[in-house]
Amino acid sequence: MKIGPPWLTRFERARIIGIRALQISLGAPVLIQVSEELSDPITIAEKELELGLLPIIVVRWTPEGKIQEIPIKYLKLRPQL
């Protein structure tokens, strides 16, 4: 990774979870087994992200205009504070 840290920032994590939760609430197929305790779209999206199942690419850029596309499977998840 040439741009940014080797982990998902809290802003990237929030955006990914929000986008995926919206997709799930609109009827997108879920990538994990859903139980009664995992019925909330946000909880499902968080679990999918933790398991590394989301085929999403994070785009990072600098003020100079350089862009780097990074699949989230190459980014580490930081523990929640």
From Swiss-Prot:
Gene Ontology molecular-function annotations: DNA binding; DNA-directed RNA polymerase activity
Subcellular location: Cytoplasm
Keyword field: Cytoplasm, DNA-directed RNA polymerase, Nucleotidyltransferase, Transcription, Transferase
GO cellular component terms, A-Z: cytoplasm; DNA-directed RNA polymerase complex
UniProt record, GO biological process: transcription by RNA polymerase I; transcription by RNA polymerase II; tRNA transcription by RNA polymerase III
InterPro entries documented for this protein: DNA-dir_RNA_polK_14-18kDa_CS, Pol_omega/Rpo6/RPB6, RPB6/omega-like_sf, Rpo6/Rpb6
PROSITE patterns listed in its UniProt record: RNA_POL_K_14KD
Gene3D superfamilies linked to this entry: 3.90.940.10
Catalytic activity, as annotated: RNA(n) + a ribonucleoside 5'-triphosphate = RNA(n+1) + diphosphate
Keyword flag Transferase: yes
Cytoplasm as UniProt keyword: yes
Described function: DNA-dependent RNA polymerase (RNAP) catalyzes the transcription of DNA into RNA using the four ribonucleoside triphosphates as substrates.
Summary of subunit composition and partner proteins: Part of the RNA polymerase complex.
Matching HAMAP family: RNApol_arch_Rpo6
Protein family (similarity comment): Belongs to the archaeal Rpo6/eukaryotic RPB6 RNA polymerase subunit family.
Protein name: DNA-directed RNA polymerase subunit Rpo6
Gene that encodes the chain: rpo6
